[in-house]
Amino acid sequence: MGSRVSREEFEWVYTDQPHTDRRREILAKYPEIKSLMKPDPNLIWIITAMFLVQLISLYLVKDLDWKWVIFWSYVFGSCLNHSMTLAIHEISHNFPFGHHKAVWNRWFGIFANLPIGVPYSVSFKRYHMDHHRYLGADGIDVDIPTDFEGWFFCTTFRKLVWVILQPLFYALRPLFINPKPITYLEIINTVTQIILDIIVYYVFGIKSLVYMLAASLLGLGLHPISGHFIAEHYMFLKGHETYSYYGPLNLLTFNVGYHNEHHDFPNVPGKNLPLVRKIAAEYYDKLPQYNSWIKVLYDFVMDDTISPYSRMKRPPKGSENLD
């Protein structure tokens, strides 16, 4: 159903990712950016408050009619849970406690994971570092869709289905592209999450558990905030691999929209990324950028030139230095 996309292959490139050279050039010109590379302890209190708000919402929905459970899971819970996944993104970069307390950050990530209902924070950390070091690398960067996704989701309707099912593909893709041995922290993450889910069921009931899980599923699928999944690296303009978004939803997402800035300086917490853009404005103002994630979702589904194949892909090579 719907017209078929024109792209039938990834955009293969044989050059290094652009962030390495730009980082080096910007730091040579603006060494003061190094002062922005520091922990953000405010994340500890913000994330804890988000956890408590979701805990309160579990109590508030426990006796609602099912239609209102689903309604509030999409309208409210989805925003909170998607925001929490991006808090986990901040934690994966060790921003709450700093790099010298990396283990504290891993435990805090497990804590932040609890309202989402599905364990993933420890695994996300492992794969996300690969995404930065080997951006677009075949068989390493699991942010790149599989060949099956590009081949099958090739019509307007199928692309819409793909957007709705994004959380499923993000969960399963690592198993097919770059499987890794399970670590003890991943086991702890899983066991802790299962225990919390059981507690939610027995204390609040099935409606609260469904609310929590639906909030994650809906919030990571066809949802305005989910536009960032596509906006960050899908090639809407040939030759451009990473795109920033400067709209208001950055307020809910720890500035993940500042994505060129983030990949240029992954050791700068989200709070300081607008300062990076301000300091080095001549570098970022000229790059392609978005002001609406909703429009990104619409264009992805409706534009026949865009599909899951619209990613720049490169053969695997040596690791990039992120310092």
From Swiss-Prot:
Report the residue ranges where the short sequence motif Histidine box-2 is annotated in this entry.
Answer: 128-132
> Motif Histidine box-3: where?
259-263
Q: Which reaction does it catalyse?
A: an N-acylsphinganine + 2 Fe(II)-[cytochrome b5] + O2 + 2 H(+) = an N-acylsphing-4-enine + 2 Fe(III)-[cytochrome b5] + 2 H2O; all-trans-retinol = 11-cis-retinol; all-trans-retinol = 9-cis-retinol; all-trans-retinol = 13-cis-retinol
Natural source organism: Alexandromys fortis (Reed vole)
Q: What does this protein do?
A: Has sphingolipid-delta-4-desaturase activity. Converts D-erythro-sphinganine to D-erythro-sphingosine (E-sphing-4-enine). Catalyzes the equilibrium isomerization of retinols.
According to its UniProt record, the EC number is 1.14.19.17, 5.2.1.-
Q: Which residues are annotated with the lipid modification N-myristoyl glycine?
A: G2
Q: Which residues carry this modification: Phosphoserine?
A: S307
The way this protein sits in the membrane is described as: Multi-pass membrane protein
InterPro entries, alphabetized = DES1/DES2 (IPR011388), FA_desaturase_dom (IPR005804), Sphingolipid_d4-desaturase_N (IPR013866)
Q: Where are the transmembrane segments?
A: 41-61, 68-88, 102-122, 152-172, 184-204, 217-237
Could you list this entry's UniProt keywords, alphabetically sorted: Endoplasmic reticulum, Fatty acid biosynthesis, Fatty acid metabolism, Isomerase, Lipid biosynthesis, Lipid metabolism, Lipoprotein, Membrane, Mitochondrion, Myristate, Oxidoreductase, Phosphoprotein, Transmembrane, Transmembrane helix
Principal place of residence? mitochondrion
Q: Which compartment or compartments is the protein found in?
A: Mitochondrion membrane; Endoplasmic reticulum membrane
**Post-translational modification comment from the UniProt entry:** Myristoylation can target the enzyme to the mitochondria leading to an increase in ceramide levels.
Which biological processes are named by the entry's GO terms?
ceramide biosynthetic process; fatty acid biosynthetic process; myelin maintenance
Q: Which family does it belong to?
A: Belongs to the fatty acid desaturase type 1 family. DEGS subfamily.
Q: Which GO terms describe its cellular component?
A: endoplasmic reticulum membrane; mitochondrial membrane
Q: Which domain of life is it from?
A: Eukaryota
What is the designated name of this protein?
A: Sphingolipid delta(4)-desaturase DES1
Q: Histidine box-1: where is this motif?
A: 89-93
What are the recorded GO MF terms, alphabetically?
cis-trans isomerase activity; retinol isomerase activity; sphingolipid delta-4 desaturase activity
